[in-house]
A protein has these predicted regions:
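Serine-hydrolase catalytic machinery in alpha/beta-hydrolase-like enzymes
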Residues: 30-129
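Flexible, glycine-rich phosphate/dinucleotide-binding loops
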Residues: 43, 58, 90, 143, ...
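Structural recognition of the beta-strand scaffold that forms the well-ordered cores
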Residues: 48-51, 80-84, 135-137, 159-163, ...
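Glycine-rich His-Gly loop
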Residues: 51-57, 140, 183-185
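Short, solvent-exposed loop/turn and secondary-structure capping segments
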Residues: 60-63, 93-95, 148-149, 172-173, ...
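Primarily recognizes the serine-hydrolase "nucleophile elbow" in alpha/beta-hydrolase
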Residues: 117-174
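The feature captures the conserved acid-bearing segment of alpha/beta-hydrolase catalytic domains
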Residues: 158-197
Length: 197
């Protein structure tokens, strides 16, 4: 019996709570589906991450759970992770031609509005979290949204991390701290990444 209790205690140290929920932004008449990964212990030191998925052609209403391997890992490390479902089935498809800084901007702006609304609502729902060290992470098109958010609302975030975003120019700024993880299969568009100059 004692052995069983110690195994349960050990497992509970690494456990987390996962759930799906939705927010409703009345000003845009928009539902924002979320996947939330909450660490076992939540307190004033618990940092918050909002994760933005890559584009999937509006085919998957659970794109915000596609990266669960990463969001779970971050939650196990003590972060409170909120993964936003950016594209809904009836949203316009992402532009695949033209000047992407223009043709994709409506999609990115919708993503920025989703992120901003989620921050505002969760600050009310979870005021005990550490919102001073807030982090944004995004992959591909979600990375473009992350960089646009960092450009428009730098005062709200501490760090912005993109994984293989290709289109949105990274702001040239000290704050927030910006990071990009790059694969070797696709290059970013000219001017997107900072140079040494």
């Amino acid at each position: 019996m004692m052995e069983e209790l110690s195994v349960q205690s050990a497992l509970s140290c690494f456990s987390q709570i996962e759930f799906s929920t939705c927010l409703f932004d009345a000003s845009r008449n928009r539902v924002i589906p979320l996947a939330v990964y909450q660490p076992h212990k939540v307190n004033s030191k618990t940092k918050v991450i909002i994760f933005s998925h890559g584009y999937d052609g509006n085919k998957n209403n659970k794109s915000n759970q596609t990266y669960a391997y990463l969001t779970r890992f971050l939650s196990q490390k003590g972060f409170y992770v909120i993964s936003i479902q950016h594209e809904l089935a009836d949203d316009p498809l992402l532009a695949m031609e033209g000047n992407f800084m223009e043709t994709r901007m409506p999609n990115w702006e919708r993503g920025v509005a989703n992120i901003l609304f989620t921050i505002q609502e969760f600050k009310k729902l979870k005021p005990q979290l550490n919102w001073n060290d807030f982090i944004l992470i995004g992959h591909s098109n979600g990375g473009d949204m992350t960089m646009l958010f960092a450009t428009r609302y730098p005062q709200l975030i501490n760090k912005a991390i993109s994984m293989d975003h290709r289109r949105m120019i990274m702001p040239r700024t000290r704050n927030p701290r910006l990071y990009t993880l790059r694969g070797c299969d696709y290059d970013a568009d000219s001017g997107v990444l900072p140079t040494e100059k």
